Amino acid sequence: MCIRDRSYTNLFKGKNFLVKELKVKKRGVLSLQKHYHRSEHWLIVQGKPIITLNKKKIMKYKNESIFIPKGAIHRIENPFKKTVKILEIQKGSILKETDIVRYQDIYGRVKQSQAQ
C-alpha cells in the first residue's frame, strides 16, 4: 500500500504479531504517533532514518534495530535521497492502522480528540 511519503507491504501475520516492510521515500516524514495496543521492533535494512522516540532523536544505520514500546511517541524521518527500508515487527492485541494516535502530520490527519 502506498501512502504519500511511505509504502508498506504486509509480509507475514500470526496470532498477535505482524511483519511488514516499510519504505520511506527521500525526504519523507511520517506522522508523530503512538499506539495503545502494540509495540514495534524495527530493523533498518537500507538507508539512515532519524527515529524520534518520545523526545529523543536517534539516527540509525543499516543492520541496526530499535524497539518502540507500546504507548511511546515515535516517528521515522528520511532526510536523505536514498529510500529507507525497515523491517517492522508488530506485537500486540490490535494490529490495525486504526491503532494510531497522531500528534503531528504534514497531511492534516491529526484529529483534535486524538492528540489531546
What are these language model-derived features?
Residues M1-D5:
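Conserved small/polar residues in nucleotide/adenosyl-binding loops
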Residues K20-H37:
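Conserved short histidine dyad/triad with adjacent acidic residue
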Residues S31-Q33, I51-T52, I68, H74-F80, ...:
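Short beta-strand His + acidic residue motifs that chelate non-heme Fe in jelly-roll/DSBH
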Residues H37-I50, N54-K55:
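Glycine- and acidic-residue-biased ligand/ion/polar-headgroup-sensing regions
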Residues H41, K81-R102:
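A short hydrophobic beta-strand segment most commonly corresponding to one strand
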Residues K55-I73:
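Short acidic-glycine-tyrosine-enriched beta hairpin
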Residues E97-Q116:
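Acidic/histidine-enriched, glycine/proline-rich intrinsically disordered or flexible terminal extensions
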